[in-house]
């Protein structure tokens, strides 16, 4: 079926979203045009405003419309000297939802990947190095993803911490709550055994 140029353009634009293929984009476009034009206009306005006004925190690099985000400006967050290093702002949301952490963050916006040409400065490790040199950080909690790249990134940052005599710790990896051992992959089970603790 031949569609209008503007409709094709809308569907192509929707495909930039993760997990949205041609069929999903077509379904979304038709829904907005046929059933929810007001919602479509609100979406367009919110996207336009977010794309122009949301930047990065000058301390932790997460998304914010201010120069410094609400976490970094919170005096209670600065007292404990902890900084949790994560790969994306979505990781902050996940950790905050637990209610178990009350320190500050540093967002890498990715991980080291020499094969893809992503080096230390590409993920802000020069900025992290500067923050470590300031002397107000006593512990770095490495919460990068448990992938090969995430582990390499965590190791690199741990070396950086050692150079500045700052404690570095890695979040635990292992068997998920409610998981069955026979269904857990070997690497995860190995991490669980190596990271065991007394009860």
Swiss-Prot record:
Functional note: May play a role in DNA repair. It seems to be involved in an RecBC-independent recombinational process of DNA repair. It may act with RecF and RecO.
Matching Pfam families: RecR_C (PF21175), RecR_HhH (PF21176), RecR_ZnF (PF02132), Toprim_4 (PF13662)
Gene: recR
InterPro entries the UniProt entry points to: DNA_Rcmb_RecR, Rcmb_RecR, Rcmb_RecR_Znf, TOPRIM_dom, TOPRIM_RecR
Record-stated family: Belongs to the RecR family.
GO biological process, alphabetically ordered: DNA recombination; DNA repair
Superkingdom, taxonomy of origin: Bacteria
Organism whose genome encodes this protein: Vibrio atlanticus (strain LGP32)
Name of the protein described by the UniProt record: Recombination protein RecR
UniProt keyword list: DNA damage, DNA recombination, DNA repair, Metal-binding, Zinc, Zinc-finger
PANTHER family listed in its UniProt record: RECOMBINATION PROTEIN RECR (PTHR30446:SF0)
ZnF C4-type span: 57-72
GO terms, molecular function: DNA binding; zinc ion binding
Record-annotated Toprim domain positions: 81-176
